[in-house]
């Protein structure tokens, strides 16, 4: 690590000496800039668009607040990520709940929170969500992910 290497004006050598290694560092200004740029580029008066940050890339309360403050949505894949998003003040209607093998408790939490979109992977999950929504007397916006079973033959690497 060279003496002058910095991210966001912070010396990496200083960080390594202060917090130890390895460590992750995100440049807050750069993240904010990218989120705003995506929103600007995808904004069109004839389209209803939403930029959604994938929490599985990295999620903590601070990142959720950055995403929220940029006016973007947040994609979560577990009940834990949903809890982080809600605790950070992310509006539930801007949360997209993905994740395979979502538990009944996770689906219930998403419904009770009023999550904007729940992505379903199969018919049994759709039936389970419908039953829970009926039981809770609420509405769910869903997207059904379909795998048509078409094989794409690609190289081995």
Name what the model sees in each region.
Residues 132, 148-157:
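Active-site loop/helix belt of alpha/beta enzymes
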Residues 139-151:
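Glycine-rich, aromatic-flanked loop segments that form ligand/cofactor-binding clefts
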Residues 1-141:
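A charged N-terminal "starter" segment
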């Amino acid at each position: 690590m060279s003496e002058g290497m910095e991210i966001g004006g912070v010396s990496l050598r200083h960080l390594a000496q202060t917090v130890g290694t390895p460590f992750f560092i995100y440049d807050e200004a750069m993240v904010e800039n990218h989120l705003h740029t995506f929103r600007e580029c995808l904004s069109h008066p004839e389209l209803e668009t939403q930029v959604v940050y994938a929490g599985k890339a990295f999620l903590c309360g601070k990142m959720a607040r950055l995403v929220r403050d940029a006016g973007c949505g947040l994609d979560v894949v577990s009940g834990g990520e949903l809890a982080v998003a809600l605790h950070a003040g992310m509006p539930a209607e801007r949360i997209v709940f993905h994740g395979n093998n979502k538990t009944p408790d996770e689906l219930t939490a998403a419904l009770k929170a009023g999550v904007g979109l729940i992505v379903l992977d199969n018919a049994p999950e759709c039936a389970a969500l419908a039953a829970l929504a009926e039981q809770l007397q609420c509405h769910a916006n869903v997207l059904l992910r379909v795998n048509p079973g078409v094989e794409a033959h690609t190289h081995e690497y």
